[in-house]
């Protein structure tokens, strides 16, 4: 699956057409059903506004919210999104009580002059995810006839646009089942694909990957996919301690040791040697007796973390090593924070490593943060606008790094 050859919405003639856009409005709501963080709605605005300005018939928005398990549940209605969307767009938004059916089709077909229509939660129907849950919480497959009703979504548009990268790894009806001649990438998806293509298909070199996480075994598919592509690999987070204990016989105190992951480190090292990849590991640590804001903290060299303590972050010498490696790279792909950045005693190493990535971006390097916890770090230290790209899709970006095909991307038309 090529990431760089997907049809962008800017290459599609939208004039006089019903533009059906899969957005990600899975936003948090408070107890009064008010949207508490509109970031995902804001992220979709460029595509929505483009469709309004260039289509002039109807802009039909569809999304999921929460996990209603294939049944109608007012708690997960998208209706609270309407006032937020209206304020952001500066125009009225029509809400439909269902996402499919004759009444919804009539509303869409009567629309004109760039009218914006928001459909009710896609996941109120079992056919969206292909299953629902019964009263006992057991999964029940959707009826074949119901799954085929993805044609009902197709009836709502003339052109399909996907701008929900965070759901691109899921082969759901709204992601892969809409059968229209042109299926384009919205601006948000287009940006995601462009940046991941820069790293995974045609990176400027040296190409550095920074990978973190608690367990090596969780990142084996990512490491395996990236080793033939990168020039250097910084291992951070808890899994670095499994590397240190296994490869260098370092005492790691009470730190988590990934027994299963340790058994394949030999293969990883051999593969790195085969592809001439430098693996960079920490050389000192910040330690803590517990993962809590009132933890007793200390420091440790590369040789030994004392019993009763865990490695909670890297030390100053490790940061210097990371900074040097980051400064030398022209493409940097980062997934996973260096340490337990939530702890008050040890934010600085994480922040210092992020600062190095920001400086690299400012000097012209491509720096991509792969969603999830790493994106949270970027937001915490207000670095989102200083990095080349912070991915909006934790699960989707992880699957791209693993070399997997994303169903929602594969379903898009080629240029």
Swiss-Prot record:
One of its GO terms (molecular function) is ATP binding. Disulfide bonds: none annotated. GO terms for biological process: gluconeogenesis; glycolytic process. AMP binds at residues 214-215, 219, 238, 311, 342. It is found in: Cytoplasm; Mitochondrion. Its EC number is 2.7.2.3. ATP binds at residues 214, 219, 238, 311, 342, 373-374. Mg(2+) binds at residues 214, 218, 373. This is Phosphoglycerate kinase. (2R)-3-phosphoglycerate binds at residues 23-26, 39-40, 63-64, 66-67, 122-123, 170. Its cofactor is Mg(2+). The gene is PGKA. Coiled coil: none annotated. Signal peptide: none annotated. It is an enzyme of class 2 (transferase). The lineage of its organism: Eukaryota, Fungi, Dikarya, Ascomycota, Pezizomycotina. CDP binds at residues 213, 218, 237, 336, 341. It catalyses: (2R)-3-phosphoglycerate + ATP = (2R)-3-phospho-glyceroyl phosphate + ADP.
